[in-house]
Amino acid sequence: MDRLFGLVQASAALEGCTLDIEQCGLLLRDGVSSAGKTISEQLLCMDLRDGYLCAQQFARAREFWSAYRIRSVADKALRNSGGGAPAAGTEPALQKICSLANTQRLHPVEGRSHEVYRASFEIHYLVSQHRIWGPLSDMMARLLMNWLQFECGLEPTVIRKGVIKDYRRVLGSATSEEIGEIFVSFMSDHEADPDETLLPKPSSREQILTLLKAHPWMSTNDLAKEIGISAKGVEKQLGILKERGSLRRVGPDKGGVWEVL
C-alpha cells in the first residue's frame, strides 16, 4: 500500500499538492491530517487514492477496458474536483484509449515490456491532448498510464522530481504540436527501473516499528544508534506511536519489552 501512496503523492504534487510522502502516508493510511495543509489538497490525495484502488481492482479482475470503467475510475479520482464525466466530444479518444489498452492486455507481456510501456505512454498523451477531464487531465492520464502497467505486471512509472520540468515541457510541446511520438519517446527514456525504489527511505517511525517487531527488547539508545537519530528523537517517536495505538510497553521500563500492535 505504501507503494501506491508514493504514486498518489507524486502525481498530486504535480497538481500543486504540498503534502510530502510521510504526510500523505499518514493521511491515507491513518486518516491523520497535517497542520497547515488545505482541505482541498488532502481531499485530492484521498480521491486519487480511491481512483488508483478502483483501477487496481479492475486490473486484478482482468476486466476489459471500456469508457464505462474509465468513467468509474474517474468518478472516484475526481470526486471532489468536479466529477469524472469526460468532456463533450471526447468519446472517440476514449474508445482509442480502450483499444490500445485491450490490444496490449490480450497478449503475454514477456519480451514485450517496452511495447506495453509505449502503449501506456500513448494513453497518457491522448488523455492530455484531448483534455478529457479539463485541468486535471494530466493527473488522470498518469492514473490510466499506471493502470495498464499494473495489469501487465510492470513497474509503474512515476514522474520523479528530477524530470518534472522536462516532463511538463515535452508534454506541452507534444500536445500543442499534436505529435504524440515526442512524448512517448521522452517517457520511454524514463521507463521505471525495477531496481529503483518508488518511495524514499522509510520514516523513523516505520524503522522503529520494524526494529521492535524483530527485537522487542531494544532500548531507546539501541534504536537511536540503529536509526541514526538522537535518543530524544526516538523517545518522541515512541510517544507518538503509543498515542496512535501502534505500540505499547509490556512490563516495567527496565526489563520489559515492546509490543507492536
Task: Enumerate the predicted regions with their spans.
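FIC/Doc superfamily catalytic core
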Residues: 1-261
